Amino acid sequence: MNPSIIKQLIEAGMAGAQVEVMGDDGVHFEARVISEAFAGKLPLARHRMVYATLGDKMGGEIHALALKTLTPEEAAKAGVA
């Protein structure tokens, strides 16, 4: 598994999301996902939304995925938009 495939899967499952995925060992990854769909949702719900886009790859091809999930407004305040 490589970061670009994970990025494509998340983008396909979350229309309009801005996604950045890093990882160089093929099983451990970090992702920053910025989406308006996260508005009003707690972190756990946001993470579940992202995991849902990856299906059975989580726990299989993807051993670990550290997530940073933000709305566009939160990203702008954090200076990452």
Question: How would you label these PLM feature ranges?
Answer:
Residues 1-26:
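N-terminal first-folded block
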Residues 1-5, 26-43, 51-56, 63-64:
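Conserved N-terminal glycine/acidic-rich loop preference
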Residues 10, 49-51:
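Sequence-pattern detector for short linear motifs
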Residues 22, 32-34, 68-70:
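Solvent-exposed beta-strand sheet faces enriched in polar/charged residues
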Residues 51-81:
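C-terminal structural segments of small proteins and small subunits
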